[in-house]
Structure formats: structure tokens, C-alpha cells
Amino acid sequence: MQNSHAEGYSTSASGNGTHAEGYDTNANGKGSHAEGIETRTTNEGSHAEGYSTEATGNAAHAEGYDTNASGKGSHSEGIETKATNNSAHAEGYNTEASGSSAHAEGHSTKATVDNAHAEG
């Protein structure tokens, strides 16, 4: 693709302006960036970094270990976190933000309705 760059082992940069680096990384969305081990991006402007992370929403960001950011503009960070709705933010360990603009942080917390905030 145009202006894409892949470096490392088993890496793929298949969208325009994408960058994949590390081991078994895949950057598909336009302008997306996947780095680390087994990371994947699939939408425009998404960024996945760390180990086994996935950023599938437009402008989503997943970082850490086994994290998933699938909502538009969502952010998931830490260990086993999920931000699955638009503008959702999950951070910490085993947290889930599934409401729109929801925020879950800490250990095993869930913010499941729109604009919710869970911490602990």
C-alpha cells in the first residue's frame, strides 16, 4: 500500500500510511499503527501496542496485555481490559467500559451504561 511500512517478523502493513513493527503484527486501517507482539489494527487512525492487543475502532487505542479497543475513539490500557463503545475508556486489570463515554478503572470493574464511571 501507499506509504506503508512493516518491520520485524511476520508483520503486515496493508493500509495506506500504516506502520507495523515487531512480531506477528498487522496494521490494516488507513494511518494505523501496530507494534509489539501479536497486535492488530483494523480501522482508520487506530493504534495497538504491547502484547496481544487489538484496536478495531476508528481512532481507537489499545495498549498493554490482552487489551481491546473496539469503539470509535475508545482507549483500553492495562491487562485484560475492554473498551467496546464509542469514547469508552478502560484501564487497569480486567476492566470493561461498554457504555458510550463510559470509564472503568481499577480491578475487575465494569462501566456498562452510557457516561458511567466505575473504579475500585
Describe the role of every protein-language-model region.
Residues 1-120:
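Periodic small-residue-enriched repeat registers in elongated scaffold domains
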